[in-house]
């Protein structure tokens, strides 16, 4: 994996290193041209599936989408298989929450804390009605001692109600 941004080891914070040094996608593309048999994946600043597809179309073997996929998984991860590979359908965030329940329950039974998982679920509904209330319920409820699946249920109910209210006003 080649990161298209050169990190500056002195003078910049980690956050500044994600923004200030320029991205050099052409360098990665030139590397692939020069070493066509080498498996190269590109990383750095890629935020959309269209960008990813563009690199794949130009011969790059793989594309890493980091923060964008984490913060808005419904727009990136759930659509990757159908849009990039032409397989399956986009995952519905509500179905993702349902599918996560057994994993969450097992984690809690093993002594884990809800917030250790729920913090990674905050972006599931980004851009959809009720996303803010979903995040608030998880952020406030999950860190509480003994928090369990009831927090997920309450967040989902509140989000669904907010979504219905929004639909009624349209």
State where each predicted segment sits.
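Glycine-rich, proline-tolerant flexible connector loops at the mouths of alpha/beta enzymes
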Residues: 4-18
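Non-cysteine beta-strand/loop elements that form the S-adenosyl-L-methionine
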Residues: 1-7, 65-68
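Alpha/beta catalytic cores of nucleotide-metabolism and tRNA/nucleoside-modifying enzymes
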Residues: 19, 23-170
């Amino acid at each position: 994996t080649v990161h298209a941004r050169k990190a500056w080891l002195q003078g910049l914070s980690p956050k500044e290193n994600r923004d200030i040094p320029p991205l050099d996608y052409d360098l990665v593309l030139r590397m692939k041209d020069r070493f066509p048999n080498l498996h190269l994946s590109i990383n750095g600043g890629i935020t959309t599936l269209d960008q990813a597809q563009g690199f794949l179309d130009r011969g790059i073997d793989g594309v890493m989408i980091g923060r964008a996929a984490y913060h808005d998984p419904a727009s990136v991860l759930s659509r990757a298989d159908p849009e990039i590979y032409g397989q399956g359908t986009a995952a519905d965030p509500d179905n993702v929450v349902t599918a996560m329940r057994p994993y969450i329950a097992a984690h809690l039974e093993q002594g884990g804390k809800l917030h250790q998982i729920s913090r990674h679920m905050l972006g599931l509904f980004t851009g959809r009605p009720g996303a803010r209330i979903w995040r608030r319920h998880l952020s406030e409820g999950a860190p509480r001692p003994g928090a369990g699946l009831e927090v997920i249920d309450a967040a989902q109910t509140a989000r669904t109600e907010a979504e219905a209210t929004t639909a009624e006003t349209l």
